[in-house]
A protein has these predicted regions:
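P-loop NTPase motor module signature
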Residues: 1-372
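Generic recognition of stable, solvent-exposed alpha-helical segments in well-folded globular domains
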Residues: 8, 12, 47, 64, ...
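Short acidic-hydrophobic surface loop/beta-edge motif
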Residues: 34, 120-123, 508-514, 715-723, ...
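Short polar/acidic secondary-structure junctions
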Residues: 35, 224, 526, 733-735
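Extended active-site and interfacial segments that coordinate phosphate-rich ligands
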Residues: 59-74, 238-246, 250-251, 255, ...
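Short, isolated positions in well-ordered beta-strands
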Residues: 128, 519, 725-728
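Second RecA-like catalytic domain
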Residues: 182, 188-189, 194, 236, ...
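A positional "C-terminalness" feature that preferentially activates on distal terminal regions of long
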Residues: 471-505, 524, 559-565, 570-775
């Protein structure tokens, strides 16, 4: 078996080897997704590294193979590094398994040491000498940009050097478009051709066709290894590229423009020595080159490791920190990978595979996306989500050529959805299948051409959808819906995996996201100009700003329901609500610092069973002690009447040492009510099943001391008057207007009652009044 980092390479190399073998061509085959081209007679099988990793699930010891060749190992992508680590463990257990690692530019010493001092075989390539010159920008770098300097150097080569094709390396697609336009105006002796990953296939093919004039190919680092540009004599290298780095703490993929390694510089310069002696002009100093890293940081040290860790757990490979990676990833990245998988429900707290995890590991996609598929089965929208999931796992199929941007935008607008970029992807899929009842490659090409879509990516989309559909269909509990899934159900499914890309609008296209980070909706999104208060994004990319590449409007309660276990809940202003008989509170809900709800009135003990003890205290204190309980409760009415009776004695005698205080009343109920009584409803249920005799207060429970009857006789309830008795009210509240004794004179007696009647107080207060008057 021979692995290649890309499908196109696996196909083309297998075809070339088959052609070289002539009559033995049947011994060669290839395996790429569902386009398998091998038979029982196949002895040499070419495949992507991802395909071989998939085979490990059913053939962990690679019994089908006598030897494995890992080609293009210098690319050090996630699959290659994981595969090398895995093969390290298998070579030790299978002495008959031969392993060959091939590459044009790798650290041979590191690879040899990792594989127990494996022999190194060096094969001289068919290359010619390359002259390296260094030409850093003149003056301060703020005075002239790398793009301007690149254009100047290229124009000078065209004017002063012998004719020949030129390859320019620039870091971004935007740079390439700008450079191409400027060079077309300055250099008339050459054909100017762009080359980058999102370029349409027909435009990419132009670099391989003969031209009447020498060509200048303006490329990203795709021309380092992915595409071999023929006929190059000159290379102009800015030494820059966009290098993706996953930031574990913020869970963001960053794509800064950064300096490439020495190995990448040498890979670029080598492109000028394929057909004869060449020249490479590096637009930086030799000291700059000497100070660069010898090799590019392996992808495994700058990527999200969730998918790798999930596969390792599935294959029972043990602790990733002890796995024999050639260059081990950071422990923080491993911890973040585990945390992500636990949040998605793929692993339990002991890092063991869950039922969700087993399903997710069977899908050749990011765990975030496979989790979405599982959720869609619950929401009866599996048909739509498998389409969207397959689209999210590949590059966006929509093309926007520089020369026809307006036409492309108009074509894409046909599929737009004002609320969701994900629905736009679904519309593209449905649009193709609506226009083409039966599948054919010619129909797909026509559809892509008419709608400015990449044929290659649409083909990848169809292939991956078929693969995911087969995997899901094998699951007995998974059912594809026949009726269209609703917008809500589709996006609630998406939230199961994409919740971390949620945000609330601050202003315009700026959103407040989780963990106190801000992000913008990408300008290419249909929601960029007009979006709702709450959105989810498909993925985050950080360039000049942090962008959500795709977006969709959502309701905040969908987000909360999807992330209940991850949300933090806090309560304030806990109080008893007399009308409902419940203990209520103001609730605040936050998801990683993002406030989903604030001051929401909720039934406090019902929100969390941990709230029951404190809710019980509030209920006893405010409903029972503070007399706010309503409804028919015999014990409560009796207790209230008894307490009120003896409190009146306290007011008459002007002392507070007769009736127990509120704390003692609280303790009385707290000792007698069980822990599960925390509101009027639970109290009613308790009384119904257990009676209320144990809740009735006796005078012994209420009184601190029993006052003398003779003392109380000095405080009569009524004042004798000529026509009828006048009621008296006693209050012991010093400093208040009604402190003392108040005569409650009926309105019809006000004019008929002589004032001197009130000169004499009740007997119990005469001594106090006399003392006051003497003073």
């Amino acid at each position: 078996g021979c692995t290649q980092p890309r499908r196109i390479a696996a196909t083309s190399v297998s075809e070339w080897v088959a052609e070289e073998l002539g009559e033995y061509r049947k011994l060669v085959g290839s395996k790429i997704s569902f386009r398998d081209k091998y038979t029982t007679a196949t002895r040499i099988k070419f495949m992507t590294d991802g395909e071989l990793l998939e085979e490990l699930k059913n053939d962990p010891f690679l019994r089908k193979y006598r030897g494995v060749i890992v080609d293009e190992a210098h690319e050090r992508n996630l699959n290659i590094d994981f595969l090398l680590g895995y093969l390290h463990t298998r070579v030790a257990k299978r002495k008959d398994l031969k392993l060959i690692i091939t590459s044009a530019t790798i650290d041979t010493e590191a690879f040899s040491s990792h594989f127990h001092r494996a022999p190194v075989v060096t094969i001289e390539g068919r290359t010619y000498p390359v002259e390296i010159t260094y030409s850093p920008p003149p003056g301060d770098e703020n005075e002239i940009s790398y793009l301007e300097h690149c254009i100047d150097v290229t124009a000078e080569i065209c004017a002063t050097r012998p004719p020949g094709d030129i390859l320019l390396f620039l870091p971004t697609e935007k740079d390439i478009r700008s450079c191409t336009e400027i060079l077309k105006g300055r250099v008339k002796t050459h054909s100017i051709l762009p080359l980058f990953g999102r370029l349409q296939a027909k435009d990419q093919r132009l670099i391989f066709k003969p031209h009447k004039k020498p060509k200048i190919v303006v490329a990203t680092n795709v021309a380092e290894t992915s595409v071999t540009v023929p006929g190059i004599r000159y290379v102009v290298d800015t030494g820059l590229a966009r290098i993706g780095t996953y930031h574990a703490r913020s869970r963001t993929m960053r794509l800064p423009i950064a300096k490439i390694s020495q190995a990448s510089c040498n890979q670029r310069s080598g492109r000028s020595g394929r057909i004869g002696p060449g020249t490479c002009v590096r637009l930086f100093s030799e000291d700059d080159f000497d100070g660069r890293e010898p090799f590019t940081t392996p992808e495994i040290q700058r990527s999200n490791l969730a998918e790798v860790i999930l596969q390792m757990v599935t294959l029972n490979l043990g602790d990733p920190r002890l796995f024999p990676f050639l260059d081990p990833p950071r422990r923080g990245a491993i911890s973040e990978g585990f945390r992500t998988l636990k949040e998605l429900g793929a692993l339990d707290s002991e890092h063991r595979l869950t039922s969700y995890g087993r399903i997710m590991s069977s899908m050749p996609i990011d765990p975030v996306i496979s989790r979405i598929i599982i959720e869609a089965n619950k929401f009866d929208c599996l048909a739509e989500i498998v389409v969207i999931a397959a689209a999210l796992a590949i590059q966006d199929p929509r093309m926007r050529p520089a020369e026809s941007e307006h036409q492309a935008d108009e074509a894409h607008r046909r599929f737009a959805d004002p609320n969701s970029d994900f629905m736009a992807l679904l519309n593209i899929w449905n649009g193709y299948h609506k226009d083409n009842r039966g599948f054919s490659w010619s129909a797909l090409k026509k559809f892509c051409l008419h709608n400015y879509l990449s044929f290659q990516r649409m083909r990848e989309w169809l292939d991956l959808h078929e693969q995911l559909h087969r995997i899901v269909s094998r699951r007995r509990k998974f059912r594809f819906n026949r009726e269209p899934g609703s917008y809500e159900n589709i996006h609630r499914s998406l939230l199961a995996g994409l919740f971390r890309q949620s945000g609330r609008k601050k202003k315009g296209s700026l959103y407040q996201g989780l963990s106190n980070r801000e992000f913008y909706i990408f300008p290419g999104s249909y929601l960029h100009a007009k979006s709702g208060e709450w959105i989810i994004g498909g993925s985050f990319i950080e360039t000049s700003r942090l962008f959500a590449l795709s977006a969709a409007n959502i309701e905040v309660d969908w987000l909360e329901k999807s992330c209940t276990k991850l949300c933090s809940y806090s309560w304030s202003n806990v109080r008893y609500h007399k009308k409902s008989g419940r203990v209520m509170a103001d609730e605040t809900v936050a998801l990683r610092g993002l406030i989903l709800a604030a001051s929401r009135i909720v039934n406090y003990p019902k929100r969390n069973e941990k709230n029951i003890p404190s809710a019980r205290q509030v209920f006893i204190r405010e409903a029972l002690v503070d007399h706010q309980l309503s409804g028919r409760f015999g014990f409560f009415s009796k207790n209230l009447a008894t307490i009120k009776k003896w409190q009146e004695s306290e007011h008459k005698l002007r002392r507070k040492d007769i009736v127990i205080d509120d704390e003692a009343i609280f303790d009385f109920y707290a000792r007698r009510l069980p822990e599960n009584v925390f509101d009027r409803s639970t109290l009613k249920s308790h009384v119904k099943h257990h009676g209320d005799s144990h809740l009735c207060m006796t005078e012994k429970d209420i009184l601190l001391r029993l006052p003398e009857d003779k003392d109380l006789l000095d405080f009569p309830p009524h004042l004798p008057a000529p026509h009828e008795q006048i009621a008296l009210r006693y209050r012991f509240e010093p400093g208040t207007p009604d402190d003392g004794v108040t005569a409650l004179v009926p309105e019809h007696l006000v004019d008929r009652t002589p004032p001197e009647l009130f000169d004499w107080l009740v007997p119990g207060l005469i001594v106090e009044k006399t003392t006051y008057l003497i003073k």
